[in-house]
Amino acid sequence: MWIKICGTTSLADAQHAANSGASAIGFVLAPSPRRVTVDQVRAIAPHLPRNVERYGVFVDAGFDEIVTAVRDADLTGVQLHTNDDPDLPRRLRAHFAAEESSAPISILAVLAYSDDMEPQIETIARHAARYGAIDALLIDSRSPVGHGGTGTRYDWQAAQHLFRRVAPQLRLIAAGGLNPDNVAEAIRTLSPWGVDVATGVEAAPGRKDPARVAAFIRNARETFAQLKSPTRPRTRDARAAR
């Protein structure tokens, strides 16, 4: 199972998450109590295991800003929130594929869940599966407070059938209000490809609680292992198997 610890702001927190078995570390490069700079991420990146992915989280960021941040912060993935350019993922994919010196960059798109959003989410999933513009779709909570990191959750039972319909076409990541105590329920209900957490493992905004980080990762992996079956689709790379 793929697990991202997001909203990380320090080397100590990033290393602890990696050593606890996280698949990816998320760095918020947008207005947020967890915001970090490209320089901060660049200082952290060399000290993480190379098989742990490093995601930059962007809100309404343009093409040039994202490309520069990926290069300067040594990111391996981008998470895109609310950009008005529907072609941005495809343009980013083409750009990084054309750079011979660039390693493959993973692209996550984010949508906030609500009942009336289901047709749009399914359309995006079909388009993504056909054109390969994104690697996964992160389904977060809808909140007036901000984009991600709000600690609120959506109705997993209501979203269950959406996850089941879309999963054969596209990897889905569950996010929004997850914590060590409920991540097992989320995995059992939604059967996501991955999970993403920020506030649910914090001691304070931007500062992780080591025990909660370790418990979240342990509970997620144990639950996934219990549900795993030979028919589950294989992931495309070894990083997701961590």
Q: Can you say where each PLM-predicted feature lies in the sequence?
A:
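C-terminal helical cap(s) of enzyme catalytic domains, especially alpha/beta-barrels
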Residues: 40-48, 91-92, 99, 198-242
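Acidic, divalent-metal-coordinating active-site segment for phosphoryl/phosphodiester hydrolysis
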Residues: 11, 179-183
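Conserved, mostly hydrophobic/aromatic
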Residues: 17, 78, 137, 155, ...
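Conserved anion-binding
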Residues: 24, 29-33, 40, 47-173, ...
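N-terminal basic/disordered segments at the start of proteins
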Residues: 3-13
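Proline-aspartate-enriched helix->loop->beta-strand connector
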Residues: 74-75, 192-195
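A short, Lys/Arg-enriched amphipathic alpha-helix followed by its capping loop at the start of a domain
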Residues: 16-22
